[in-house]
Amino acid sequence: MSKVVHTSGKRKTAIARGTVKEGTGRVKVNRKPVELYEPELARLKIFEPLELAGDIVNSVDINVRVVGGGIMGQAEAARMVIAKGLVEYTGDMNLKDRYVQYDRTMLVGDPRRSESKKFGGPGARARKQKSYR
């Protein structure tokens, strides 16, 4: 039986779930090959963990499904799933260290969320100006 690893990752309001299993190096995000992912900046973000991993990528298939959030939030959530999945699949601590040194958010989530808007102004903190005359 082949080894299958399920992982999940979040960024802002985007949630990604993915599987890493034995294969031929195919990487798909929302059922599309990652090479066709647009815009280019988001595609490059998703490619980062694959390039840092080296030859390991050619022996696994990665499928990622992302929902919610915006384009870059989804890209960073997918990137986290790929990085976590490869580390768990290989069990390689050197790979984990390489990811952490490159960018810690590849493996560790970013807890920041946007603050909700309150009444009395246009945003979360901004208020209507007062005139004292």
From Swiss-Prot:
Any Pfam family the entry gives: Ribosomal_S9
Superkingdom: Archaea
Region called Disordered, residue ranges: 111-133
Coiled coil: none
Keywords: Ribonucleoprotein, Ribosomal protein
One CC-aspect GO term: cytosolic small ribosomal subunit
GO biological process: maturation of SSU-rRNA from tricistronic rRNA transcript (SSU-rRNA, 5.8S rRNA, LSU-rRNA); translation
InterPro entries found in the cross-reference section: Ribosomal_Su5_D2-typ_SF, Ribosomal_uS9, Ribosomal_uS9_archaeal, Ribsml_uS5_D2-typ_fold_subgr
Gene Ontology molecular-function annotations: RNA binding; structural constituent of ribosome
Gene3D superfamilies with a match to the protein in the record: 3.30.230.10
Similarity section: Belongs to the universal ribosomal protein uS9 family.
HAMAP family, per database record: Ribosomal_uS9_A
Name the record gives this protein: Small ribosomal subunit protein uS9
Gene name, Swiss-Prot/TrEMBL: rps9
